[in-house]
């Protein structure tokens, strides 16, 4: 009988065996679930930080739109009262970083301390690993270089939401980025000149840098990509002052990229002037070299400005500095405390250039 019944069971399986198989499956599933909980927790901590990392004045948000969702943290200084319209600085992190989690733009720049002293709002968007495995912003992807789409649309949406939610000054919204975030900041200056008054690139490159062959950069002149940046501005075209900070020893983004960026943005200004690349925009050049103080890196400051004194592009080329955000109080993997105070430089630049 037993043999007969066994032969009649589907696939020759005995009735008890599927139960043991299911029990093993449940055990394995349970183990996997338990393993995924800490992995998920660690991923969340990496990207969004831990509750006790929050400082006074910090608030977390998620921007939602048809384009997608974007997490970000806002820091409100003590001067914030909901009625006085304060300036805004959006700080965009680089690869292997987050906005306000582990190895964050928040700790790297120490903007919160400066904001508390000077009275401005800071915004830290953070990339999601499902968009980029090493948490880069996708500024080298042509699909992420246009208005109304992708990361530019999300970040501009965040900026607008902050202005509305916290009654910030829409004429004093600025963006600063590091590395891939610097590329995104330049893209935002081109695609949303009606949202961002100025842009800062720290260890970043020009709009459309992905079109430039590192082995033959001269084959793609800066005015070629500048025309594309200007065309992205559309009816909102205007001079968006750009600040560039670059380390001479940067092996990831070499100094030639910053040199190109300066020429590129000067060309954008030329196109904005009359739609032609014809030197119609007269620029006055000023160069200042700051010698090394004890324990500090020397640097050269270049300023290209209109005859009326408005900066078109300024750059800081820092000797003995690599692929970092410089500043005396920076805390993170990509910092150099011997460099000039980039956060203070960004703020001083922003103060001089509200949207006109």
PLM regions with names:
Residues 2-88, 103, 107-109, 113-118, ...:
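A domain-start/cap signature at the N-terminus of enzymes
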Residues 79-80, 95-97, 127-132, 205-206, ...:
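Acidic glycine-/aspartate-rich tracts in secreted/extracellular proteins
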Residues 154, 234, 240, 256-260:
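Folded extracytoplasmic luminal domains of secretory or organellar precursors
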Residues 252-257, 326:
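Conserved alpha/beta-hydrolase "acid-adjacent" motif
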Residues 63-73, 83-174, 178, 183-191, ...:
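Serine-hydrolase catalytic machinery in alpha/beta-hydrolase-like enzymes
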Residues 315-329:
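Active-site-adjacent mobile loop/cap segments within catalytic or ligand-binding domains
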């Amino acid at each position: 009988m037993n043999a007969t019944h066994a032969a009649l069971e589907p696939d020759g399986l005995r009735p008890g065996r599927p139960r043991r198989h299911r029990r093993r499956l449940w055990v394995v599933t349970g183990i996997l679930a338990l393993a995924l909980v800490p992995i998920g927790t660690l991923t969340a901590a990496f990207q969004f930080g831990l509750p006790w990392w929050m400082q006074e004045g910090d608030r977390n948000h998620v921007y939602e739109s048809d384009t997608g969702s974007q997490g970000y943290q806002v820091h409100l200084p003590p001067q914030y009262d909901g009625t006085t319209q304060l300036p805004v600085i959006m700080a965009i992190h680089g690869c292997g970083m987050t906005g306000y989690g582990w190895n964050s733009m928040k700790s790297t720049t120490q903007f919160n301390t400066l904001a508390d002293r000077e009275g401005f709002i800071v915004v830290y968007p953070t990339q999601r690993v499902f968009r980029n495995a090493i948490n880069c912003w996708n500024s080298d992807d042509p699909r992420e270089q246009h208005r109304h789409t992708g990361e530019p649309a999300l970040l501009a949406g965040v900026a607008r939401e902050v202005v509305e939610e916290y009654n910030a000054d829409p004429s004093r919204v600025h963006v600063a980025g590091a590395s891939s975030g610097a590329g995104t900041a330049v893209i935002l200056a081109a695609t949303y000149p009606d949202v961002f008054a100025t842009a800062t690139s720290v260890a970043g490159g020009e709009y459309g840098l992905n079109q430039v062959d590192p082995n033959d950069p001269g084959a793609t002149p800066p005015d070629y990509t500048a025309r594309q940046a200007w065309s992205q501005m559309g009816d909102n075209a205007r001079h968006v002052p750009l600040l560039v900070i670059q380390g001479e020893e940067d092996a990831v983004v070499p100094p030639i990229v910053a040199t190109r960026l300066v020429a590129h943005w000067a060309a954008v200004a030329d196109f904005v002037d009359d739609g032609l690349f014809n030197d119609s925009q007269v620029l006055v050049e000023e160069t200042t070299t700051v010698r090394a103080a004890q324990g500090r890196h020397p640097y050269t400051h270049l300023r290209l400005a209109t005859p009326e004194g408005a900066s078109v592009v300024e750059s800081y080329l820092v000797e003995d500095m690599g692929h970092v955000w410089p500043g005396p109080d920076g805390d993170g993997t990509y910092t150099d405390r011997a460099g000039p105070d980039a956060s203070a430089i960004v703020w001083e630049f922003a103060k001089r250039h509200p949207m006109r």
